[in-house]
Structures are given as C-alpha cells and as structure tokens.
A protein has these predicted regions:
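Hydrophobic transmembrane alpha-helices
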Residues: 2-91, 101-102, 106-177
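Detector for methionine-enriched segments
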Residues: 1, 8-9, 38, 142, ...
C-alpha cells in the first residue's frame, strides 16, 4: 500500500508539473482567461483530453493484489485494475473549463479507459462523464464570479470526484479477485 501511494504521488506530481508549466506559458494563459469562448473550450478539451489519456497510460496496474511493473499501460488483462490520476484530470478540466470541457474530457478519458480493457471497464464512461459534469458546473459557478478555484476548494472537489468514481467501481466492477 505504501508503494502504491508513493507511485501515485509521482503521477500526481507529474500532472502538477505539467499544469504549472502550462499556466506559465503565455499562450495558455490567454486560453484560460478567455475560457468562455468556444475556441478556448476546444483547446482546453484537447489539452486536458491529452492529459487524461496520458494518465491512463501512466497508471499503475494491479492484478491479484500485486503491483504489476509496467512503464506504459496500453492494455489491461480482464483480471487487472488500474490506479491512475484520470479522475483528477477530469475534475480539473471541469473546474477550469466548465461543464462542456469537463464532460467532453470525461468522455474522452472514459472511452480511452474502455479501450485499454480490464474487467468490466464500461462503467468508466458514465462515471467520468458525471465527474466532468459536476466539476464543470462547480467551475462555471466560479467563472461567473470571475475567480479561479482555490487550492483548498479544488482539493475538496477532487476528493468528492474520486468518491463518485469509487462508488461506480464498488457497484459496477464485479469481483476482480
């Protein structure tokens, strides 16, 4: 469990580093400041959709309660699951871009996860869509106030989005043991 935690923190750190670099790129700053425009929404969908796919590929495969060493997850066996930062990316995309961006990134991430395989993976599509929509509606409320979400608010939203994902896993994943 400690090993999985450390590996997941590495993945979260990578996402934070990429986000930090993007926020400091002037072009991306302009996209964020004009996030209500459709052209900006499309760009945010492409950027966060790519991040979500990267999160799926760099996830940690778990089979038979063991971490399976992999560098890039292109396929999962039917008895394996994956620990990744996909839900974090979907939540952030919704907070930043609103419900259109969040739900579209959720669909991209969910369908990509289904393509990866693994047991009973189809529930990731509606789960990711719901996460994107909820985070998006919360993000759009913040945008109307012309503020970006604080770190604390984002952390709480992220935890809630992960809980939604876990509820879907609990009810729809079946027995993976």
């Amino acid at each position: 469990m400690v090993e999985l935690f450390i590996l997941m923190m590495e993945r979260v750190g990578l996402i934070i580093l990429l986000a930090f670099l993007l926020v400091n790129v002037p072009y991306f700053k302009r996209v964020l400041l004009s996030r209500e425009k459709m052209s900006s929404k499309v760009q945010l969908i492409l950027i966060f959709g790519l991040f979500a796919i990267i999160s799926n590929f760099t996830g940690i495969e778990i089979a038979k309660n063991q971490i399976v060493p992999n560098n890039l997850l292109t396929y999962l066996s039917s008895n394996a699951s994956i620990a990744n930062t996909r839900t974090l990316v979907i939540g952030v995309s919704g907070l930043v871009g609103g419900p259109i961006v969040g739900s579209t990134v959720g669909l991209i991430a969910g369908f990509h996860r289904v393509i990866q395989g693994g047991g009973h993976s189809f529930f990731y599509v509606p789960a990711s869509l719901i996460v994107g929509l909820i985070a998006g509606f919360l993000g759009s409320r913040m945008a109307k106030q012309t503020v970006f979400p604080s770190a604390g608010f984002s952390a709480i939203v992220g935890a809630c989005m992960e809980m939604i994902q876990m509820i879907f896993i609990f009810f729809f994943s079946g027995d993976l043991s």
